[in-house]
Amino acid sequence: MPIVRFIRSLLLFLFFIVYTAPYATACFIAFPFMNAERRYWMAVGWCRSTLFVARHLAGIRYRIEGQENLPDGPAVLLSKHQSAWETVAFPAIMPRPLCYVFKRELLYVPFFGWALGMLKMVHIDRKEGKYAFASVVKQGRLRMKEGAWVIMFPEGTRTRVGQQGKYKTGGARFAIDAGAPVVPIAHNAGHVWPRNSFIKYAGTVTVSIGKPIDSTGLTPDQLNARVEAWIEAEMRRIDPHAYRDAGGGASASSGKAGKRGGGDRADTSLG
């Protein structure tokens, strides 16, 4: 019922307000006495708590397909982007530390940005101009040598359920320059945690992890095309009702799904 859904969403929102600030404060106090890996896993504790509370308050569950496809070595994860859910959930469900690529401006966001600045992530400084990408590659290589996986969202912005954004080549370029394979990821989180909506919906998110794509000998356009083809085909498999044309390109979703999850302007890709 709508009123029950609203109450659950409100309780989840209050959880974020009440829980995030003290957790971030605890991180600030503890981080100076921890190495980078322990800092990361302490921060991931917040993500795990969020998934636990989202499950019991809002009925949001998830299942993972293809987890055996995750490699033992360095990798670049390129994922579909529909929701804030995947940003929170992926660190909690992946067996290795994840290194997000984000705009430097996010470091100045209270609590979230401050904690982010104490973790080993990759940041983009647009003021560096043409040297920005080289800086990202340098940071990413170092993080992968330390055992992390670099993760990006090639569409850059969160797309509506049933729609396909333009896949930018930055993630593919990074993987080629770093000499790492790409692991494509599809999911349908936009149904339960829609963008631009206070209301959350009960349901199960399917996260599908594809086999690694070797970047050796490929151009950025070729690698990007393979990633896009796999993700979009997989989206139509795990969420067929959201696409009016299962074999076509970008399409709007119909019915209730189409009303959830608008786009945003937070660029999370590289050119």
Cite the ranges covered by each PLM segment:
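Non-catalytic C-terminal accessory region of glycerolipid acyltransferases
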Residues: 3-6, 133-271
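Thr-Gly-centered strand-to-loop micro-motif
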Residues: 65, 101-103, 124-126, 154, ...
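N-terminal membrane-anchoring alpha-helices
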Residues: 1-63
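Catalytic core of membrane glycerolipid acyltransferases/transacylases, capturing the structured
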Residues: 24-45, 55-57, 72-129
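Generic preference for hydrophobic
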Residues: 64, 77, 100, 207-209
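Glycine-rich helix-loop-beta junction characteristic of Rossmann-like nucleotide cofactor-binding loops
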Residues: 66-70
